[in-house]
Amino acid sequence: MNGSPTPKRYSSKSSRLYDDYYNIPYQYSNPTPMNRDYNDVGSRINADKLVPEEYKRNTEFINKAVQQNKELNFKLREKQNEIFELKKIAETLRSKLEKYVDITKKLENQNLNLQIKISDLEKKLSDANSTFKEMRFPKVKDPMVDDDPVSENYDQINVPKHRAPDATGNPRTTNKVSNTSDQDSRLKAIERTLSVLTNYVMRSEDGNNDRMSPLPSPLNTISPINNRLNFQEPKRYNPTVKVNPSDDDIMMYESAELKRVEEEIEELKRKILVRKKHDLRKLSLNNQLQELQSMMDGDDNIKLDNVSKHNHATHRHSSQSSRDYSPSSDACLECSNDLYEKNRVKPENNMSETFATPTPNNX
């Protein structure tokens, strides 16, 4: 089928004069050949001579510029990715820094509060020590000096020369006695509290020292009796002996004391439990021993009843060597074995009943 747009009527089969004219390819167009090195005739064309040098230089420059542009774009993308990662890291570090700044501020405030508390406690302790010293060692006043200003003008006082022997004492002395009694009671109370505190602190300090370097036991020394007589219980650590013991030290000491008491209680419970177990075991063993003794006594009576006087002449033995002529035996060996086999059934039954574990009565 003819694919041309020309109708079929214009092409006659008789005359093929213009068929080749219409079928000439590339008549009205000049397409580029497939191989540019050759022209239509077939001769080789030198394309380098036709292209000017400026165009070649421009193309090389443009190609280099395009390649550089691609490389720079690739590097730019890498740098942008690095910048993005660094921004993420910076944000995380900034958040951590803010968090640590808040924590440091809180710790500084706590430290200031603790310092204030410590200073207050030190002041209270110094005041208490000063009052204790004043109460413990009061100033001795000069007996010739009197604090009363009236005594300075003693010439103006009319003192009677002759006093009655039954006159009451000086009211100043009575007041002084009452004041001294009150002071003594206060001093005794303070001394008691201080003694308790000092013992507490000395125990805690000695307890820590004992942990670091344990004392040798007095039983291992050369003279154990003297050491036992002169041996004193090691003092335990007590934080209150310090000048300004902290709350943590006191809490640690109290927890250690509680733990020690609990351990002692557990040890005593364990000893009591072991003692109870031993008592129960002893009771069961005593019961078992009594049953065995009763069984042995009963078996001996049965054997004595069953075994009669034996006469060797009534039995015919295989040989005379089998006879037992010992003074303690009344029968020969063969006859005694027969008697043993006959009487063995009863002891076995009794033994099975005896060796059953008895159940002790609950005390």
Curated annotation (Swiss-Prot):
PTM annotation (Phosphoserine): residues: 213, 217, 284, 329
Gene Ontology cellular-component annotations: cytoplasm; nucleus; spindle pole body
Entries under InterPro entries matching the protein: Spc42
Record field: compositional bias (Low complexity): 319-329
UniProt-annotated stretches for the region Disordered: 160-184, 310-331, 343-363
Known role: Forms a polymeric layer at the periphery of the spindle pole body (SPB) central plaque which has an essential function during SPB duplication and may facilitate attachment of the SPB to the nuclear membrane.
Family indicated by similarity: Belongs to the SPC42 family.
Main subcellular localisation: nucleus
Ranges in coiled-coil conformation: 62-136, 248-297
Quaternary structure and interacting proteins, as annotated: Component of the SPC110 complex containing at least CMD1, SPC29, SPC42 and SCP110.
Protein's organism: Saccharomyces cerevisiae (strain FostersB) (Baker's yeast)
Chain intervals with Polar residues compositional bias: 170-182, 349-363
Gene of this entry: SPC42
Keywords, comma-separated and alphabetical: Coiled coil, Cytoplasm, Cytoskeleton, Nucleus, Phosphoprotein
UniProt name for this protein: Spindle pole body component SPC42
Pfam families recorded: Spc42p
Subcellular location: Nucleus; Cytoplasm, Cytoskeleton, Microtubule organizing center, Spindle pole body
